[in-house]
Amino acid sequence: ALWKTMLKKLGTMALHAGKAAFGAAADTISQ
């Protein structure tokens, strides 16, 4: 179904955004 594809895309985007945010936070903490 189309909504499943959309949901998967949203999940992937959220995962990447979360990783980016976590990486930025880790960089800030380590400085």
From Swiss-Prot:
What are the BP-aspect GO terms?
A: defense response to bacterium
Coiled coil (UniProt feature): none
Claim: Secreted is one of the keywords in the record:
yes
- Describe tissue expression: Expressed by the skin glands.
Q: Which UniProt keywords apply?
A: Amphibian defense peptide, Antibiotic, Antimicrobial, Secreted
Query: What domain of life?
Result: Eukaryota
Question: Record's GO cellular component, any one?
Answer: extracellular region
Give the location in the cell: Secreted
**Record's InterPro entries?**
Dermaseptin_dom
Any Pfam family matching the protein? DD_K
- Identify its protein family: Belongs to the frog skin active peptide (FSAP) family. Dermaseptin subfamily.
Function, as annotated, reads: Antibacterial activity against Gram-positive bacteria S.aureus and E.faecalis, and Gram-negative bacteria P.aeruginosa and E.coli.
Supply the name of the protein: Dermaseptin-DI3
- Give the species this sequence originates from: Phyllomedusa distincta
